[in-house]
UniProtKB/Swiss-Prot annotation:
This is 2,3-bisphosphoglycerate-independent phosphoglycerate mutase. The gene is gpmI. Mn(2+) 1 binds at D404, H408, H464. Its EC number is 5.4.2.12. GO terms for biological process: glucose catabolic process; glycolytic process.
Length: 515
């Protein structure tokens, strides 16, 4: 018979951010005697839950999916765009072993470096800043033939906005005294994802054979001719860019090709056209045996070419680490946030880990939650308190959705009610944890209810915020709080409170030091 467990409980108050100003602040203006006393008397700190601290672009508000991924991973989990921006800013991009080896190989064998991708500042499939960094990397490492094959956007950017990008790269090549834009084509052809192989073939022939419907001396002239034909960026027909006397930029055996899109769905088809021996979408007039073909990120597991930035593997998330150490865990929330404390918290793993139980409480069936700001918190608290006292679990992770779901309605009075309801719930949870001689962490995944009106417009503020969130410790250990934390520090904090080893994959730091 196993001994009764003293659980460590993580309570996530969704949308419960920290803001000092009282105006339009449903959290500060609500009557919260329990949270007030905890904040005054218990070890506590504020932690970052937005922007680069959670792997989002700088200044971007946090969200529940990203928040829970970071909470469970114990490390910052970067989106591809942010990860690449950061790599370039820190200089690590320029020493990426896959990219540098591919360029060095071309330099050594006297071959061309072809760079292709969506030349756009849209940031959805690619970013031209990444392409610029790649051009600079190739030039710095001594590549003498650098050819940029520009796919034009007009979907994630205005329909006719490519000219500034083409001018920027034309100027860069002039400054380098080396390389050029070799072709332009609309994404409608190069980035099809619906097996319209007639479109892809036009792009493939342009790239491999320098064969296009149109030719121009320079990229801007080629674009202006397309506009004159009535083609917007997305639909620019295959155009070879080649001034009189210039060698063509067809792709040849031994050349290096680097594909600079980071989003996979619209690059799989054309990539397979290049690399699959058994490709049968259309008859390829020319099959190029590249020295190196590099995809920037992994476009598909079955595309067997080198990848500069493989997916960040989320091994040893908090839940998986508990399983490996034979610990029991419970995940509990209402419908609205159930996926967050399970799938997202587990780093995108759907199946529960061994020893992981789950309890789903149905959220109330109302049109909007301002009509029932307490949501299903009474039932959720009852089940949570029962689980804490059951002695079954080493760890319990619970999400209360009220602050976020009611915050999204923009109804200030309802948000105040939601926060006051939560205070009553926390009172019961604290009592249960103390009775079980356990430990409790109270935090949030991002802010919302602390800012219910937009000061700039005077309208209801229904979105998340970029503000920090509280972290409070209640328990049987004497601990000292550390400042400057973020969501990815919570999992290591929990492991240290349980006196467990922290896996090396977790780069977060414990925020409560046992004295």
């Amino acid at each position: 018979m196993s001994s009764t467990k003293k659980p460590l409980v993580l309570t996530i108050l969704d949308g419960y951010g920290h803001r000092e100003e009282q105006q339009d602040n449903a959290i500060l203006n609500a009557k919260t005697p329990v949270m007030d006393v905890l904040w005054q008397q218990q070890p506590h700190t504020l932690i970052a839950a937005s922007g680069l601290d959670v792997g989002l672009p700088d200044g971007q508000m946090g969200n529940s999916e990203v928040g829970h991924v970071n909470l469970g991973a114990g490390r910052i989990v970067y989106q591809d765009l942010t990860r690449l921006d950061k790599e370039i800013k820190d200089g690590d991009f320029f020493t990426n072993p896959t990219l540098t080896a591919a360029v060095d190989n071309a330099v050594k064998t006297g071959k061309a470096v072809h760079i292709m991708g969506l030349l756009s500042a849209g940031g959805v499939h690619s970013h031209e800043d990444h392409i610029m960094a790649m051009v600079e990397l190739a030039a710095k490492r001594g590549a003498t033939a650098i050819y940029l094959h520009a796919f034009l956007d007009g979907r994630d950017t205005p329909p006719r906005s490519a000219e500034s990008s083409l001018k920027r790269f034309t100027a860069k090549f002039a400054e380098l005294g080396n390389g050029r834009i070799a072709s332009i084509i609309g994404r409608y052809y190069a980035m099809d994802r619906d097996n319209r192989w007639d479109r892809v073939q036009l792009a493939y022939d342009l790239l491999t054979q320098a064969k296009g419907e149109f030719t121009a001396d320079n990229a801007v002239a080629g674009l202006q001719a397309a506009y004159a034909r009535g083609e917007n960026d997305e639909f620019v027909k295959p155009t070879v860019i080649q001034a009189t006397g210039e060698a063509d930029a067809a792709m040849n055996e031994g050349d290096t090709l680097i594909f600079m899109n980071f989003r996979a769905d619209r690059v799989r088809q054309i990539t397979r056209t290049f690399v699959n021996a058994d490709f049968d979408g259309f008859k390829r007039d020319k099959v190029v045996n590249f020295g190196d073909f590099i995809m920037l990120t992994e476009y598909a597991a079955d595309i067997k070419v080198a990848c500069a930035y493989p997916p960040a593997s989320l091994t040893n998330t908090f839940g998986e680490w508990l399983m490996k150490h034979d610990k029991t865990q419970l995940r509990i929330s209402e419908t609205e946030k159930y996926a967050h404390v399970t799938f997202f918290y587990n780093g995108g793993v759907e199946e529960p880990f061994k020893g992981e139980d789950r309890i789903l409480i149905n959220s109330p069936k109302v049109a909007t939650y301002d009509l029932q700001p307490e949501m299903s918190s009474a039932e959720l608290t009852e089940k949570l308190v029962s689980a804490i006292g059951s002695g079954k679990y080493d760890v319990i992770i619970c999400n209360y959705p009220n602050g976020d779901m009611v915050g999204h309605t923009g109804d200030y009075d309802a948000a105040v009610k939601a926060v006051e309801t939560l205070d009553n719930c926390i009172e019961q949870v604290v009592a249960a944890v103390k009775a079980a001689d356990g430990q409790l962490l109270i935090t949030a995944d991002h802010g919302n209810a602390e800012q219910m009106r937009d000061p700039a417009t005077g309208q209801a503020h229904t979105a998340h915020t970029s503000l920090p969130v509280p972290l409070i410790y209640v328990g049987n250990k004497a601990v000292k709080a550390v400042e400057g934390g973020k969501l990815s520090d919570i999992a290591p904090t929990m492991l240290s409170l349980m006196e467990m080893e922290i896996p090396q994959e977790m780069t977060g730091k414990p925020l409560f030091i046992v004295e």
